Amino acid sequence: MELNVGAMTNVELQLARMVEAKKQRRRSHKQNRRERGHKSPSERARSNLRLFRFLPFYQVDGSELTGSCRHVNVAELPESEASRLELSAEDHDFDDTDWFAGNEWAEGAF
């Protein structure tokens, strides 16, 4: 049983439409992921560089941000790198019992 030429072109047109619809779905899925905040590692590195470029108080080496994103375990690092990651005393020097410290609304509200 042979198909005529008209039926063959119809099948090819349907196949082309299906392929185009699949490409469109893939494209919109990628765009939706970006809008929801799901980024590839390279997109994440680019956005990190763009954000940190405008912070005058934070000197960033670009190699740190473009590298692979991984969690750092301080216990596994050498002593010199572990001490660099720890906060200084003035960064976290506060009274744990003073819950409303620095909250202007709570200080004058009652």
Curated annotation (Swiss-Prot):
Motif (Nuclear localization signal): 22-27
Disordered, as annotated region: 16-45
Subcellular localization: Host nucleus
Alphabetized UniProt keyword annotations: Host nucleus, Host-virus interaction, Inhibition of host innate immune response by virus, Suppressor of RNA silencing, Viral immunoevasion
GO process terms (BP): symbiont-mediated suppression of host innate immune response
Record bears the keyword Cell membrane: no
Annotated Pfam families: Cucumo_2B
Subunit: Homotetramer. Interacts with host AGO1; this interaction blocks AGO1 cleavage activity to attenuate RNA silencing and thus counter host defense. Interacts with host JAZ.
Record's protein name: Suppressor of silencing 2b
